[in-house]
Amino acid sequence: MQGRKIAAFSAMLACAALLLGGCGAEKAVDKTDKSVKPVIVVGSDNYPPYNYEDVDGRPTGIDVDLATEAFARMGYKAVFSVIDWEAKKELVESGEIDCIWGSFSIDGREDQYRWSAPYMVSCQVVPVRSDSDIYTLADLAGRRVAVQTTTKPEDIFLSHDDPRIPAVGEIFSMQNRELMYPFLSKGYVDAVAAHETAILQCMADYGLEYRILDEPLLTVGLGVAFAKEDERGLEKALSAVFEEMREDGTMEQIIGQYLNEPRGYMGGGDR
C-alpha cells in the first residue's frame, strides 16, 4: 500500500513538472517574440564627436545617439562595431556590419553604396598652427599636408580636380587620424585637412590653438551607407525616420548635446 502511495505521488510530481515546464517554455517564446529586437551592426572608427567611447567604455557621440534612436523607431537594436576605416567597404559588403555610419560623406560615392538621405551638413576644412603664414588654400602650394586615408581630403589633394587646390609638396596619408594633430603641432606638417567638427572637438579636448582657413575644402551631406546588394530597403526606411526626427525635434536635441547651433548642421558633412 505504501509503495502504491509513493508511486502515485511520484506520478503527480512528474505531471506537475511537465505542466510547469510547458508553461515556462510558452512564456519564453512569448518573451522572445515581443521583446527581443533584431540587431543592426553599425560600423565606424573612433571619430569624436560622432562616434567614440565614454569614460566607461560605452559607445557615444552624435552618430551613436542618432543610430540608436532611429533604428529603435524602425524596430531594431543598434550594436556598434569599431572598424578599420580603410576596410569599411569590404566589411559592409561581406555582411560583417550592416551599415557604415561614421560621419561618412555621400559626395563622390553615390554609386558605391545604397545611401540614406543626408542627416547632417558639414564641411572639410584646413587648420594650421596659429603662427603659420598660410592664410588661403592657394598658400598650400608646395607645403606638407596631413590627411586620414580613404577620406575626401585625401581624394581632393591627390586628384587635382579642384582648381582652387594647388599642388602641395607632400601628402601624409595616415590611418590613425589622431596622429595628424601632433604632426601639425610639432611642425612635421604645415597643415591638416579634416572634418570641421572633429577638428573643433580635438582642439577643445587637448587645448590646441589652431587657425582654420576661412575657405572650406568642401561642403557636402553625411549619410548612412549600406551595401549595394542589400535589398532590405533599410536606407529608405531610415530616410523616412530622419524626416520624422527632424519634425519632432529629436535630431536637433541630439546634435545639440554635442555641437552649438545644431540647426546649422541639419541640412544635409563630409569625410
Identify the residue ranges that each predicted region occupies.
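Extracytoplasmic small-molecule ligand-binding "clamshell" domains
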Residues: 29-103, 173, 248
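Bacterial N-terminal signal peptides that target proteins for export
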Residues: 1-10
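A ligand-binding cleft/hinge motif common to bilobed small-molecule-binding domains
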Residues: 90, 103-112, 156-159, 183-219
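Ligand-binding cleft/hinge of the Venus flytrap
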Residues: 53, 67-76, 153-175, 203-207
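Extended ligand-binding regions for polar small-molecule ligands
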Residues: 24, 64-73, 131-134, 138-152, ...
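Acidic, polar ligand-binding/catalytic clefts
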Residues: 64, 68, 77-139, 211-216
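Periplasmic-binding protein-like
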Residues: 44-45, 121-128, 204-243, 261-271
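C-terminal motif of bacterial Sec signal peptides marking the signal peptidase cleavage site
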Residues: 20-22
